[in-house]
Design a protein with these regions (language model features):
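Internal helical hairpin/lid segments
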Residues: 226-317
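Structural motif
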Residues: 85, 132-134, 188
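A conserved active-site cap/scaffold subdomain adjacent to cofactor or substrate pockets
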Residues: 165, 183-252
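Active-site-adjacent beta-strand anchor residues
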Residues: 115, 136, 218-219
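Metallocofactor- and cofactor-centric catalytic cores in central/energy metabolism, strongly enriched
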Residues: 1-130, 144, 148, 152-157, ...
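Secondary-structure boundary elements
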Residues: 127-131, 153-160, 181-184, 213, ...
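Flexible, glycine/charged-enriched surface loops at secondary-structure junctions
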Residues: 27-30, 161-162, 238-248, 274, ...
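Phosphate/pyrophosphate-binding betaalpha-module
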Residues: 136, 140-203
Length: 365
């Protein structure tokens, strides 16, 4: 298939769904990791094409959703300083911190600017030498190379007024954490294709070896996801556990080597806290010592914060595939995209937002 329309072809999608029905002889619980995949499933009703025995649960692959509450609070604290320009991706502005969000901080007079590329933050620093420019650098492996390039560029130019508040997370350690959890029900994973375009597929081999669980790297269109489900069902029904790549048009086994090189130049692997989940060993990236001059935590001596999620929010269970958004008593009533209790309701990749926009069964409106 060469053209996008083919990956949305109803005839092909229904044929794949039919084969899934024919091959499924027992119940299976499958998890799509990426929030973009979740939105495709909800938008096109793909789960409703599957047999009752196939349950799709949603994973922690929404970068905005897993950015720690403490990081949001730190960003707000920095933004409210009169000498600081806080630069962020737009998705982060309405993510609730413990008391406020960046959009409210902006309304209070904070200089918060939206960027579509990390290099825009470097440009802002270059153009405002009398201000301290902090870039909120979040995301999975997908955005890490571009964020690393921003730090590399700032160092090359000798910019002394640029820094980054980093909250980068890695997918394979998150899958490992899910697998060792006593509450885990997942029997097969659809790995996020966009992440794998950067890092390739090789990092998933250890998971298959250690847990004997099938993993299929999948794309983001309806046909991609149904084909990935079919590939998982084939493996599970045959008692196999191997790594397969459905997203061959974009993902290679080795990934993007130059992107990996700039990541390795700027970042190193570290333990990382995930919002609603807790700390996962070796699941994040932090700036290397050679780039510590661009670490906002050090520059502003931010220290460590400890804050709790709203008691009513079940986003932690949603991000681990333990509950669906509609299981939340606040869903669609006390928690909406306009007034979110948790990040999954406000992010464009959040599972709660996907359910709110495409499927609000049983919710009073």
């Amino acid at each position: 298939m060469k053209y996008l329309d083919e990956y949305r072809d109803q005839r092909i999608a229904r044929a794949l769904a039919s084969e899934i029905v024919q091959r499924t002889t027992r119940p299976w619980v499958l998890m799509e990791i990426c929030g973009g995949q979740t939105h495709t499933i909800m938008r096109y009703g793909l789960d409703e094409l599957l047999p009752r025995g196939i349950e799709l649960v949603h994973g922690p692959g929404c970068p905005v959703c897993v950015t720690p509450l403490e990081t949001v609070d730190k960003a707000i604290e920095l933004a409210l300083r009169p000498d600081v320009i806080l630069v962020s991706y737009g998705d982060m502005l309405r993510v609730p911190g413990s008391r406020s969000d960046l959009l409210r901080a902006k309304a209070q007079g904070a200089d918060v600017r939206i960027a579509y590329s990390p290099t825009e933050a470097v440009k802002i620093a270059r153009s405002n030498p009398d201000r301290k420019v902090v870039f909120l650098a979040i995301g999975f492996e997908t955005t890490a190379p571009a964020n690393a390039m921003a730090a590399w560029q700032a160092k090359r130019e000798g910019l002394t007024n640029f820094s980054m508040l980093v909250s980068h997370v890695l997918v394979p350690p998150a899958i490992r954490a899910l697998m060792v959890s006593q509450t885990n029900r997942v029997q097969g994973f659809i790995a996020p294709g966009h992440v794998c375009t950067v890092v390739g597929c090789k990092d998933y081999e250890g998971l298959i070896r250690d847990f004997r669980i099938p993993i299929v790297v999948g794309g983001f269109e309806p046909v991609d996801i149904l084909e990935a489900v079919l590939m998982l069902v084939r493996q599970l029904e045959a008692g196999e556990a191997k790594l397969e790549n459905q997203y061959v048009r974009s993902v290679s086994y080795q990934g993007n080597l130059p992107a990996q090189q700039i990541m390795a130049e700027v970042f190193e692997v570290a333990d990382q806290k995930w919002r609603g989940i807790g700390s996962i060993p070796q699941s994040g990236l932090r700036l290397r010592e050679d780039y510590s001059a661009y670490d906002a935590n050090r520059i502003f001596d931010l220290g460590e914060l400890t804050v709790d999620e709203p008691a009513e929010c079940i986003s932690a269970q949603v991000l681990q595939g333990l509950k669906k958004p509609t299981d939340c008593p606040a869903f669609g009533m006390r928690c909406t995209p306009e007034n979110p209790l948790g990040a999954p309701m406000v992010s464009t990749e959040g599972a709660c937002a996907a359910y709110y926009h495409y499927r609000r069964h049983g919710v009073a409106t």
